[in-house]
Amino acid sequence: MKTVHLLLTGLSINILLLSLNRLTSFTASYLQPFEFLRWLDFNAMIPIPLLSILLYYFLLKDTVKGSAFKKTALYSFLFVMFITGVYLFGASSGDHEVTNYLNTRFCDRGETKSTLCNIISYNDDEFSHYVYYLGFVLMNLVLIFMEYNVPRQKEMVKKDYIFVSLNALFIGL
């Protein structure tokens, strides 16, 4: 369980980084050339989601390590679903962050009613969110099904339940 605790702590830290990135002015400056993005958009598009994906992958890998389940057709199917979730999660991050930047900078957060701004606003506030949640749900469902098919060999003790619960509460906030 030590590896799981470390990975869950990594996810909690990643959420903290995402919150600091979004809710503070530390990352409000522009990237060059042409002020093509803000640092906050860049961080939320590449390093933060990448860290999330890596942590999810390592959780999946830890769940099935040494298991004969990895040789089954169900595992192959679930792994393809995981890759699909990763792709959708990544595509949505790219779509959302760029259109969020454009919407904020050129469309007055959706208040400008031109055709271009309507398209940007829709990609920012709706389409990218649908794709994000589909990817996020797929990755989580795969982890749940993997855990179901390869139950932990060692029983969780009270300390494990406390640690997992604290991480869940932090992530849930």
Predicted regions, residues:
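Membrane-interface interhelical connector segments
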Residues: 99-125
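Transmembrane alpha-helical segments in integral membrane proteins
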Residues: 52-60, 132-154
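Transmembrane alpha-helix/helix-exit interface in multi-pass inner-membrane proteins
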Residues: 88-108, 144
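N-terminal membrane topogenic signal
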Residues: 1-13
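Alpha-helical transmembrane segments of multi-pass membrane proteins
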Residues: 12-29
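Hydrophobic alpha-helical transmembrane segments of integral membrane proteins
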Residues: 87-92, 158-173
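Alpha-helical transmembrane segments of polytopic membrane proteins
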Residues: 37-51, 92, 127-136
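Hydrophobic alpha-helical transmembrane segments
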Residues: 117-141
